[in-house]
């Protein structure tokens, strides 16, 4: 992590770091599959028309073009294309927009409600800052229905993510839940009709503080000081149970949409409070910048690392995907895997027990033993023990050093007894202990079989 | 597979198809790790300077640019860039060139010989044809040394790939091995100095036949009819053991480089013949188009699907990566995962036993049982059994249909006995068999636990 990326914003991990990332991805996948989510991948490129459909112009998009075509344009042999041509190709900047397209295209082949997970790289041409990569991996789950989708899924997906994050060596986290209808209904109830504008200002609350947001609300949305104060009073409400409902009612605002949002959020928070106590709160300051959310919205902070921003965000979208009159409402959450792994590595929250999968390094006493040593390794691998074979009969000290540099715990020796018969011994190079072993039945302790990724000691 | 890609050359799988691809990737990863290869990923983008360093101009490269910049250029507010600017970004078209850069950049942090696997998407802006995707996944293994690398690794990597491919439900395959030194030494020995030109012509042998290649050799490389005949006689040699050596000698050509190549190839083929009988042959027609190979080269055909082209190719490269005077010779092989999976799916060589991970669908008798049903599912998941819970107490027929459409084998029912106590039953919806079960200890048969991907019946 002290290494500098050779291209700013494009991070690459060393093998031991990649093991931490792989552990995160494997753990997430395992949890998602235990909950019945099917894995899919979508292509890395979308048309600009698709990507910008929901007005996501604030995302810095990477366009893609065939080099041969660019050269023909530069040479005057081809007409330049409009850079904003909706048919132009660009790299996806999240997995939700591509998933919505996938659902619409494949609706006839999918069973709804469709539960899917998707773990892929995405790209944004942003200015790189700490925690802002230009290439990063997201891990998403979504449930999408055909026509309608039970509100129970709003709690379900958050519970799955709570379980997934809880299985990672990252310590405490808190899922903060709000509801767009609640917020929009409240704003309308106090006479602010530009609800998107209010949300944009409220979204800046943690960054700039309440006074600045009050000023923004008055200057940019035309709120009165009283309206600004009420919007801020709403955003100040945060409870771990459904008591937020009373606190909202105490503000004395009424609106049909507000009622709907209160009911929905109370249902979600009650379920989370019961099934994942301490993992979630109702937090009415959560806005989520994205236009396509229509109900529940989520953000997640890593406790003690709040300035990192949200590590797992999402929401309910009732109209992101549609095909003629047919709509596919969905709800989902997305983990920023790269952001999380960068933090895990830079803070040494988790470490891999070695840098290679190998558990046993089979040493060579004589060069011509190589094939027999491969037989030993093959016997070990048959029982799931990763093994490598030396390629030449160097001094044992050098062969042990090969294992030591990689953190390989065991070195296997093939010798001869006084009668000239083959004898096998295995050495734990950490303790120096060495004893006779049979390649057909020796096994290492379970914790040495594969590289372990664990929370580092505090 | 009958679906048409919405962007030509960019394939996306349905969930059941993705399970086949995932099975391929999991199997490869497992084999690579058992052999001590460490997984890494490199960024999707490289600079054009890196990508085109080895003269790979025949690959159609996708350039990447920030849309915002393109728009400024179009509006005349920014100078257009040279499309061939070596600092320009582009998507990688293979994993070998990026890996070479990674090794050079991180040499101080890696232990050599460095064994790594890498499974990622790559992109080529080619005209899509059957089997030629514009976005596809490659699975590579390479071993790279610091200064020198034992020739034993040339056999080692081929054996690992033979084991990996042998673990896939794809039937027979054959790794065809040749050696650049052997071929180049032979061509020089018969007086043909433009060895790259000869290789380019020989590379077309399977496509256009020997007569056309003879014509090409004479027209494009300036060979005499006798020289062309000798080059073709070499390419005609194919043996499963080291007897190719005698057959080459019988052609009466001598050259120092030829001798070196014969020795190297004989060593590799002898090892493969002994340790993976029937999986590999010496095939002196194998040329490999890429410039960077310097010794052993490999291609692999799927028996009965030869027209698909090579599914696993690679070779030894002694000079791809260097840093000042320090060189990092390597040898590796790359599986064309997408090409292979497309064939597996289109020929129905393998099928997934269901389209979702879920083994048990917990039905609801009453809406208010949802949380208790989640407790049942949680108990199952604790034992590694993927489970989903219904969100509403629809008619049992509809709930069973939900499971049936997805291929979920078991439906769990929560009822009450006459005394009002909770009773659990589980139904195998394939046989209709239903019996009492305890959520704390019931387990499905091993073959129903997770989706199975198996070779389809012939």
From Swiss-Prot, chains A, B:
Q: Which GO terms describe its cellular component?
A: cytoplasm
Cite the PROSITE patterns for this sequence.
AA_TRNA_LIGASE_II
Principal location listed in the UniProt entry? cytoplasm
Q: Record's SUPFAM superfamilies?
A: Class II aaRS ABD-related, Class II aaRS and biotin synthetases
Query: What EC number(s) has UniProt assigned to this enzyme?
Result: 6.1.1.21
Does the record carry Thylakoid as a key word?
Answer: no
Q: Which family does it belong to?
A: Belongs to the class-II aminoacyl-tRNA synthetase family.
What interactions and quaternary structure are annotated?
Homodimer.
User: What is the protein name given in its UniProt record?
Assistant: Histidine--tRNA ligase
* Source organism (scientific name): Micrococcus luteus (strain ATCC 4698 / DSM 20030 / JCM 1464 / CCM 169 / CCUG 5858 / IAM 1056 / NBRC 3333 / NCIMB 9278 / NCTC 2665 / VKM Ac-2230) (Micrococcus lysodeikticus)
């Amino acid at each position: 992590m002290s290494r500098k990326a050779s291209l700013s914003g494009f991070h690459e991990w060393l093998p031991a770091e990649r093991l931490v990332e792989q552990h995160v991805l494997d753990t997430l996948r395992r949890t998602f599959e235990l909950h019945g989510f099917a894995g899919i991948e979508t292509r890395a490129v979308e048309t600009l028309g698709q990507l910008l459909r929901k007005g996501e112009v604030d995302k810095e998009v990477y366009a893609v073009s065939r080099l041969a075509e660019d050269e023909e344009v530069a040479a005057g042999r081809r007409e330049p294309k409009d850079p904003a041509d909706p048919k132009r190709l660009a790299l996806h900047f999240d997995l939700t927009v591509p998933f919505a397209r996938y659902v619409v295209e494949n609706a006839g082949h999918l069973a709804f409600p469709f539960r899917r997970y998707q773990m892929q790289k995405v790209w944004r041409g942003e200015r790189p800052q700490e925690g802002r990569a230009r290439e990063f991996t997201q891990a998403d789950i979504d449930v999408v229905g055909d026509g309608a989708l039970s509100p129970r899924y709003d709690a379900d997906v958050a519970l799955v993510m709570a379980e997934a994050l809880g299985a990672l060596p990252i310590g405490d986290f808190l899922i903060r839940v709000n509801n767009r209808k609640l917020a929009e209904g409240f704003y309308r109830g106090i006479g602010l009709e530009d609800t998107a504008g209010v949300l944009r200002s409220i979204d800046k609350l943690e960054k700039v503080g309440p006074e600045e947001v009050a000023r923004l609300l008055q200057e940019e949305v035309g709120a009165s000081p009283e309206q600004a104060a009420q919007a801020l009073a709403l955003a100040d409400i945060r409870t771990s149970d459904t008591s937020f409902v009373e606190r909202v009612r105490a503000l004395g605002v009424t609106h049909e949409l507000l009622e709907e949002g209160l009911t929905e959020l109370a249902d979600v928070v009650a379920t989370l409070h019961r099934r994942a106590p301490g993992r979630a709160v109702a937090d009415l300051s959560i806005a989520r910048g994205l236009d396509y959310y229509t109900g529940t919205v989520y953000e997640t902070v890593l406790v003690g690392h709040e300035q990192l921003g949200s590590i797992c965000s999402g929401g309910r979208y009732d109209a992101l995907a549609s095909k003629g009159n047919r709509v596919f409402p969905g709800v989902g959450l997305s983990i920023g895997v790269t952001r999380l792994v960068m933090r895990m590595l830079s803070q040494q929250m988790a470490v891999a027990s070695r840098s290679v999968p190998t558990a046993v390094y089979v040493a060579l006493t004589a060069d011509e033993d190589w094939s027999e040593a491969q037989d030993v390794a093959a016997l070990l691998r048959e029982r799931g023990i990763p093994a490598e074979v030396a390629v030449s009969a160097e001094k044992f000290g050098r062969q042990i050093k090969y294992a030591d540099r990689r953190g390989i715990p065991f070195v296997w020796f093939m010798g001869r007894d006084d009668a000239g018969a083959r004898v096998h011994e295995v050495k734990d190079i950490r303790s120096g202990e060495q004893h006779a072993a049979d390649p057909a039945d020796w096994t290492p302790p379970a914790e040495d079989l594969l590289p372990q990724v664990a929370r580092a000691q505090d």
